[in-house]
Each structure stands twice: as structure tokens, then as C-alpha cells.
């Protein structure tokens, strides 16, 4: 008994399913036996088919700056009314939805006008849903690669304005009319819809605004009614953290190394030039990396490229400064003469302004000792010539402190033997040579000090130029924000 009851229930279930399939099949034949998918669903030729459009973004895949290509994954919701597909579910056992292959139904043939890969249509021809009353809905997925003119002026602190332009490839503005869909609250969805639950956030770009608009272009003549475009705009802002960590910070640190060349001695011009040129080479590598990222355009120079060019110019100026300082530091009195004006500026004025004045000279220098030794030699010569003791000579020298003893000494030396005069001449020559060497050494020291003063001035100038220039360049990128447009945010918080 129980087995018979179970068998009866199974038969009823199979019969019900078969009956349901038969009802859908009957509905399909009822609707499509005399249906022509090539004809517009209008009763009169002058009537217009109203197309309701809704674009849902599921993933902003990428923006290729080099190729200026935007890749997006979307769902395109297209709804319209087809009077030829009108039916009542009461006549077909309550079948309220009929799923039909898209090639069996008239389609408005909406394509992406600004695609770049030749794929105008959707990625997958999903089934069309036919509802009671002749309402038709089609929700195909698509992956579009569209053109997007990239503005690289503030790269990597930039934002881009990309568009998705949809148009009916076959029908003009008088044959089909586009309107935006309406949500459950009755609000018009005049923007790209983003389902936060299904949306995958991009790691490089953030979507700020995604408004939509419908624009009708009038034809050039009365016989051409014109076209209608549905334009969705994606205003996206770059997330610069990747470029800050991997390019900007290393570039700033390497560029700052060029200032360390000033901490080398003024005479070490070769080492200073080596440091600066190595920094130049490193900056060239960074500039090459940026050139591989941005599009090949002459319309603008990216912010990061401008910064690299700026620091390369600073490094070049530092190399020139090192050469000039080395040239000044190695000058000698035999090749160059120092003007009093230049000496006053470089040895007195600039060191005092920069706080690098040399320590005051000790009054107890070696000159009096050398002078005393010279006087001692002369007194010894006179003692030998005149056969007088040293005490008497010193006593006489003290009596004639105003120079009378020098005159007497010269008179006595004039009458001395030639050998003694030769010795005195030799001593005078040695003393004169010593004085010349001391003067030359002081002159060389002055040239070195002047080179050091120039080096200090150029260091502070390079430091100020590097700091102010870097700050101004990057502040331009910081203030490059997306303007407050009269659109609601694309993704509601």
C-alpha cells in the first residue's frame, strides 16, 4: 500500500514537471511562431522604442597609461517593451517569465562606441527574459577595453577622466530612445551603478564620480535624424602609495646624496665630481623607469619627470661648482693675482656672514723669533769683525735703539773682509727666500680659503634650491585634487 502511494506521488511530480515544460513550450510557440527578430517592436513606423539602460560596474580591472586603455567589467541592463510578446500568465498555467536565447528576440544592438580592441558587443550572449505583458529584459556581462586619454601632468598624483560611450549601432534617435533606469525608490539611476557587495576594489585607482548623461546629436540634414549617445564618465583618482615608496622616496634620498659632496675638502674636486656624477646616473635610471610607464606624448611632462629633471640640473650645477672651486683652490701667486676687492669679499665678508670666520691670529707668531735670530747673526758677524765682546755690542745697540747701531754695523761690514760679506749676503738671501716662501704660502692659503668660502656659499645655495624646488614641485601634486563636481559619490560610504 505504501509503495503504491509513493509511486503515485512520483508520477504526479513527473507529470507536473512535464506539464510545466509543456506550458513553457506552448508559450514559446505562441510568442515566436510568427515572430521576426529583425523588425522593430512598433505598431507604426514613426513610433519610437524606449530603451531603459543601466550599467553596473563589477570591476575596474586596469588603466594602461602607456596604451591609454581602460579595462572594465560591467553588466549591461537593457529593458524595453515588445508588444508582440504580450501574454497573460493566467493563460499558461502561471508562467510569468520565459527565458529565450538572445538571437530569437529583437535587440537594440547597443555597442561600446569608443572601444579599442574591436569588441563592440558583449562578452556572453545570455538569455533574454520575457515577462508578462511583453516586457523584455536582457542583462549580458561584458569586459570592455575603451580608450581613455591619460593626462600625465601630475603623475603619480593624478586623476583621470574616462568615458564609456554606448550607442545603438543600427537605429537612430527617432527609432530608439534611451532613458535611465529607476531604482526601487523611484530615483533615476543616472550614473554607473556599483554594487559594493560584488565590486572588487582596484589597488591602484579609486573611483570618485561616475555620472551618466544622454546626449542627442542632430543630423547634418533633414534626412539624417542624428544619433543618441549614452555617456558614462569614470572620474578615477590614483592611489600614489606604490610610487611614493618605490620611486619618490628612493629618488629623493639619492638626490640628497649630491649635497654630501660639499662635505669633502675643497681640494678634493675629483671625489666631489665622482659623487655628483654617480647621483646623475642614478637619476637617469629613475627617469628611464618613468618613461616606460607613461604614454609617449609631448603634450605634457609628468610631475615626477619634472622633479628628476630638476634634481639633474641641480646635480649638474654642483659638478660645475666643484670644478670652479677646485680651480680656485689650486691657484698660485705665479699664475693669478688676487684683487683687494675679491679678497675682502671672499676672506672677510662671506665667512663673517656664513659664520665660518677663521680663529683670530695669535700675536705671538714666529716672525719675532726669526727676526731675533737674524739680528743675532748680524751681531755675531760684527763681533767677529770688530773683535768686541757681545755684551758691549748689545750695550751699544741699546744706546742706539733708534737705528744708529744698524748704520754703524753697515759701515763696519763695508770694511770687512770679502768672505764675511759673502756670508752676510748669503744670510740675507736665506732670510729673503724665507720671507718669499712665507708670502707664497700665505697667498696659497688665501686661495684655499677663498675656494672654501665659495664652496660654503654654493652649499647653502644648493640646499635652499633643492629644498624649495622639491617642496614646490610636490606641493603642486598634493593640491591636484578632483574638483567638487555636482555629482553624488560613485560609491556611497
UniProtKB/Swiss-Prot annotation:
The chain crosses the membrane at residues 240-264, 273-291, 307-328, 457-480. It holds the Pfam family Neur_chan_LBD. It is a multi-pass membrane protein. One of its GO terms (cellular component) is postsynaptic specialization membrane. Residues 265-272, 329-456 are cytoplasmic. After binding acetylcholine, the AChR responds by an extensive change in conformation that affects all subunits and leads to opening of an ion-conducting channel across the plasma membrane. PANTHER family: NEUROTRANSMITTER GATED ION CHANNEL. Pentamer of two alpha chains, and one each of the beta, delta, and gamma (in immature muscle) or epsilon (in mature muscle) chains. The muscle heteropentamer composed of alpha-1, beta-1, delta, epsilon subunits interacts with the alpha-conotoxin ImII. This is Acetylcholine receptor subunit epsilon. It comes from Mus musculus. The lineage of its organism: Eukaryota, Metazoa, Chordata, Craniata, Vertebrata. The gene is Chrne.
Amino acid at each position: 500500500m505504501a509503495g503504491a502511494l509513493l509511486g503515485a506521488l512520483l508520477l504526479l511530480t513527473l507529470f507536473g514537471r512535464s506539464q510545466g515544460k509543456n506550458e513553457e513550450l506552448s508559450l514559446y510557440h505562441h510568442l515566436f511562431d510568427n515572430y521576426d527578430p529583425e523588425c522593430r517592436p512598433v505598431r507604426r513606423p514613426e513610433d519610437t522604442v524606449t530603451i531603459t539602460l543601466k550599467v553596473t560596474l563589477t570591476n575596474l580591472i586596469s588603466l594602461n597609461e602607456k596604451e591609454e586603455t581602460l579595462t572594465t567589467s560591467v553588466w549591461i541592463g537593457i529593458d524595453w517593451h515588445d508588444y508582440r510578446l504580450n501574454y497573460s500568465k493566467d493563460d499558461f498555467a502561471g508562467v510569468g517569465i520565459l527565458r529565450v536565447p538572445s538571437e530569437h528576440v529583437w535587440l537594440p544592438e547597443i555597442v561600446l562606441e569608443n572601444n579599442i580592441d574591436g569588441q563592440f558587443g558583449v562578452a556572453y550572449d545570455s538569455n533574454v527574459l520575457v515577462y508578462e505583458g511583453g516586457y523584455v529584459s536582457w542583462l549580458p556581462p561584458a569586459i570592455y577595453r575603451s580608450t581613455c586619454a591619460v593626462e600625465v601632468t601630475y603623475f603619480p598624483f593624478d586623476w583621470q577622466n574616462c568615458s564609456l560611450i554606448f550607442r545603438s549601432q543600427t537605429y537612430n534617435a527617432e527609432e530608439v530612445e534611451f532613458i535611465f533606469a529607476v531604482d526601487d525608490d523611484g530615483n533615476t539611476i543616472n550614473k554607473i551603478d556599483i554594487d559594493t557587495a560584488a565590486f572588487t576594489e582596484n589597488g591602484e585607482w579609486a573611483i570618485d564620480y561616475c555620472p551618466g548623461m544622454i546626449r542627442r546629436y542632430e543630423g547634418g540634414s533633414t534626412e539624417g535624424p542624428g544619433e543618441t549617445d549614452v555617456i558614462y564618465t569614470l572620474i578615477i583618482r590614483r592611489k600614489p602609495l606604490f610610487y611614493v615608496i618605490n620611486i619618490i622616496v628612493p629618488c629623493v634620498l639619492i638626490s640628497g646624496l649630491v649635497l654630501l659632496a660639499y662635505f669633502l675638502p675643497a681640494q678634493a674636486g675629483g671625489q666631489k665630481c665622482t659623487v655628483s656624477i654617480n647621483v646623475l646616473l642614478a637619476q637617469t635610471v629613475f627617469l628611464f623607469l618613468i618613461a616606460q610607464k607613461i604614454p609617449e606624448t609631448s603634450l605634457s611632462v609628468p610631475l615626477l619627470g619634472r622633479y628628476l629633471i630638476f634634481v639633474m640640473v641641480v646635480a649638474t650645477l654642483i659638478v660645475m661648482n666643484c670644478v670652479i672651486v677646485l680651480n680656485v683652490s689650486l691657484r698660485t701667486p705665479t699664475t693669478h693675482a688676487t684683487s683687494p676687492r675679491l679678497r675682502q669679499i671672499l676672506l672677510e665678508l662671506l665667512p663673517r656672514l656664513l659664520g665660518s670666520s677663521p680663529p683670530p691670529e695669535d700675536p705671538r707668531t714666529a716672525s719675532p723669533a726669526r727676526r731675533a735670530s737674524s739680528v743675532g747673526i748680524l751681531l755675531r758677524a760684527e763681533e767677529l769683525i770688530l773683535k768686541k765682546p757681545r755684551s758691549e755690542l748689545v750695550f751699544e745697540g741699546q744706546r742706539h735703539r733708534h737705528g744708529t747701531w744698524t748704520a754703524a754695523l753697515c759701515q763696519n761690514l763695508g770694511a770687512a773682509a770679502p768672505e764675511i760679506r759673502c756670508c752676510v749676503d748669503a744670510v740675507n738671501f736665506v732670510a729673503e727666500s724665507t720671507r718669499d716662501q712665507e708670502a707664497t704660502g700665505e697667498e696659497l692659503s688665501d686661495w684655499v680659503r677663498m675656494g672654501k668660502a665659495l664652496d660654503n656659499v654654493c652649499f647653502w645655495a644648493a640646499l635652499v634650491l633643492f629644498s624649495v624646488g622639491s617642496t614646490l614641485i610636490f606641493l603642486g601634486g598634493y593640491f591636484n585634487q578632483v574638483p567638487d563636481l555636482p555629482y553624488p559619490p560613485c560609491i556611497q560610504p
